[in-house]
């Protein structure tokens, strides 16, 4: 049955396409019980915005020019985030609240616009902005200028090995635990981990801090820090996959402890998707898509090191770890949208957050190349070509291994792959009314005891249950 939009008739495929794209780009919240937190407050926000601007304009002291610029920039960011809450899409997630993910998308748009602005500056102007943000950056030095790398690699002692377990090793471990939670695939995680170590070898002629002893690179990085983080992240993934999700109203919880537990669990996923990046029936487009995923991931990691080397700031500076934290946050919806684009045949376009993330990755690379021409003039083109071929080889090797595993052990794995936080079921009547002229755009209501695709995740191997946010054995 076709649906109508104005005078144009939509086919069933068009309806399915719009529905699938909306599920990853504009996720809706199901079973809302606290209406106040999900009801639009546009008039309230408008009044707050006008009163705030009046207060800032007529009451604050504007005698200090630098303070005027700084507070003006912060106000622009603040009110841009308000517009983000009102106008931007939720993305694929709804926990802890869609407004948070709208602001995350708004921050990514602001960062994208900032990178565009930086492209039109010269190096002295960029450094002036950095010195204005932090005057101490005038005295910053490159780590490569004061430290030695890959020295006396034949000397292996327990004291030397233990000295490498610093804050950066801790960051490696937890960073890979978070990456495993995002990617949810042993094969891809290990491939990215090994490929990154190879990337360091190919770009070692540009960044001296990429030089490492073999035991540091293989044992400490790949096996212990990265491998331990991947294992921990995948254990958490398996635990979340095995749980049964049944979220109910705060009103149905009558104890104070239960309400507190339910409030805390609002910051956990509403459901969990079992991920299959590749299967034996995948097309060449899927293979190419995963290769592109690998390239962009490696590029984002490279940007971290090139930015701090070219613009001279330490890894411990807020400009470094703040960017890493920000990229990590926007990676979550990006990976979810990209995975849906690769695996869902009904999804014909990438989500907006995924699009902005891709632009940010390439813009950062362009900024590095523009302001680091002295550095990149030393680039060995042959190394870059070998790097691209190496990434391609490791990607196809990984996919071949995943296909082999799926063929021989796939029958033991779960094959169900649901859309995370998806409040939709294939209700034909609502699909028709959704795109009909003058129709109510709200999804169909389910009875309290019905089995919803997003509020319940059944698995016959499940050992634990979550009801109203309170675990029961």
Curated annotation (Swiss-Prot):
Transmembrane region(s): 36-56, 73-93, 103-123, 187-207, 217-237, 287-307, 320-342, 356-376, 381-401
Parts of the chain on the Lumenal side: 57-72, 124-186, 238-286, 343-355, 402-473
Domain of life: Eukaryota
Major localization class: endoplasmic reticulum
Gene Ontology biological-process annotations: phosphatidylserine biosynthetic process
Family annotation (Pfam families): PSS
Name of protein: Phosphatidylserine synthase 1
Biased composition (Basic residues): 455-464
A GO molecular function held by the record: L-serine-phosphatidylcholine phosphatidyltransferase activity
GO cellular component: endoplasmic reticulum membrane
Enzyme superclass (EC): transferase
Pathway listed: Phospholipid metabolism; phosphatidylserine biosynthesis
Region of interest: Disordered: 420-473
Record's catalysed reaction(s): a 1,2-diacyl-sn-glycero-3-phosphoethanolamine + L-serine = a 1,2-diacyl-sn-glycero-3-phospho-L-serine + ethanolamine; a 1,2-diacyl-sn-glycero-3-phosphocholine + L-serine = a 1,2-diacyl-sn-glycero-3-phospho-L-serine + choline
Role played: Catalyzes a base-exchange reaction in which the polar head group of phosphatidylethanolamine (PE) or phosphatidylcholine (PC) is replaced by L-serine. Catalyzes mainly the conversion of phosphatidylcholine but also converts, in vitro and to a lesser extent, phosphatidylethanolamine.
Record-listed E.C. numbers: 2.7.8.29
Topological domains, Cytoplasmic: 1-35, 94-102, 208-216, 308-319, 377-380
Cellular localization per UniProt: Endoplasmic reticulum membrane
Family: Belongs to the phosphatidyl serine synthase family.
InterPro entries: Papain-like_cys_pep_sf, PSS
